[in-house]
Amino acid sequence: MSIWDRLGDFIARVSSSASSGVADVVEAVRTVFSGDPDLRRRVAFSVAMIALSAKMAKADGIVTQDEVRAFQEIFEVPPSETRNVARLYDIAQQDVAGFEIYAQRMAQLCGSGHANCMMLEDILDGLFHIAKADGLIHEREGQFLHRIAEIFRIDEAHYEAILSRHVNLGAADPYVVLGIERGKPFEEIRKRYRKLISDNHPDRLIARGLPQEFIKIATTRVAAINAAYEMIERGLRHA
């Protein structure tokens, strides 16, 4: 049985309750998949992305076809499960609980309990990918994403690194892309670079619960990291 079959069964169970909300969704993920940690992580990532995408759309007030396509780049949903994914999306969008409560619950569900948790950074990265799909991150979307980062305990340097990959602010600052302060010794820069490359290896991404489709998006992340490191290395070599 694929993850989408399991996720479809789960969503059908949650949506059958008339009072379904974030508390029901989170508790169901914890209990239904408690015996399979790997599957639980994959379901948790999918649920967080779907629910927070819905909340972002509600905050922005509009969903464009470009954003729908961007979502489909992260998740290749089988036609048989499209209805169930739409159910979860609707639960989140119609729930009176605000997006901050959703973000807090998703952080508890997906996070490690530490600042700059990689899985939560992946979720934020995915939300940026969707938000920028229509060519512009609107003001409300930007405010939403920054607040999500705060709730996820993603510090400003890591947030700026994610932002720099999605928003064209002119020539990207390579130090911002790597999330490291300018002026640090080259050994620290190289150590940071190697950690980023290791964290973004496909095996690591899958282990964190990311779907196969997300790995294609992560290649853009790795390309930006490589380019930033090469730029710093060249600059220091000619200094």
Predicted regions: what they are:
Residues 1-55, 65-239:
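Small-residue-enriched hydrophobic alpha-helices in membranes
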